[in-house]
């Protein structure tokens, strides 16, 4: 729903650019092409987050800090299943990045 709203408001490309920018700032480039389909984009973000949680936890925390995902939202998640956790974190990351893009466009 979040990505379809971005598409409706013609901000999908800006969302991809923002995500790419913040992942690059965290020294964990995502390099998602602006031509990527929304479903693939969500999966790419989720896969990258899964790998960070599993293999590079410090970099994962740095990424959350750079993107400014609220810590209390992360603490509410159940970390027992890494695949599910990465899916939930990917949603929070995309949600926060969408807020940035939307506010920048509106104001």
Residue ranges and their predicted role:
Residues 1-31:
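Membrane topogenic helices and adjacent juxtamembrane segments
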Residues 5, 9, 31-39, 79-83:
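Conserved phosphate/pyrophosphate-binding and hydrolysis machinery centered on Walker-type P-loop NTPases
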Residues 7-11, 68-69, 89, 93-98:
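Solvent-exposed aromatic/hydrophobic patches embedded in short alpha-helical segments
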Residues 21-62:
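Amphipathic alpha-helical interaction modules
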Residues 46-87:
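Amphipathic protein-protein interaction modules
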Residues 76-107:
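Amphipathic alpha-helical binding modules
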